[in-house]
């Protein structure tokens, strides 16, 4: 009797976006801590590709190659709609959750809301910034 490869192994997807750090990345650590296998993905955002110049795209390509090398050539770099790409990976690997860094910019927050609205379970941890917006308070009145 054959058993599904998805039944005993807990898999999470870590969706890299602007923050390609491996060290000191709270969202990546959270994704790793509660799974047996991590699937790393970078979805090539068609809007960003269209709006970027050659130098920015070359830098992104170099950065993704370096990240892939650091991950032992296990980074999935896929162009397409975020929801479709993530759903295909979830189905292919039987992943339970998609982990991300909390996004604060309007475009990224709207993108993440669209992914969540599609029924994909998103776990938001940390921030793509060294210090999350709103965490540093002015001494005079304790406002951000």
Describe the residue ranges of each PLM region.
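Trp/Phe/Arg-rich N-terminal binding region typifying the photolyase-homology
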Residues: 2-144
């Amino acid at each position: 009797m054959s058993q599904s490869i998805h039944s005993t192994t807990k898999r999470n997807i870590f969706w890299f976006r602007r923050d390609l750090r491996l060290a000191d990345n709270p969202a990546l650590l959270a994704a790793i801590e509660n799974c047996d296998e991590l699937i790393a993905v970078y979805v090539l955002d068609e809007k960003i590709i269209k709006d970027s110049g050659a130098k920015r795209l070359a830098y992104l390509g170099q950065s993704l190659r370096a990240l892939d090398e650091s991950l032992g050539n296990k980074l999935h770099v896929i162009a397409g709609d975020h929801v479709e790409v993530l759903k295909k990976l979830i189905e292919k690997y039987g992943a339970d959750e998609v982990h991300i860094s909390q996004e604060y910019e309007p475009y990224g927050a709207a993108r993440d809301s669209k992914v969540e609205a599609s029924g994909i379970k998103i776990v938001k941890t940390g921030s793509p910034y060294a210090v999350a917006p709103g965490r540093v308070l002015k001494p005079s009145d304790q406002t951000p």
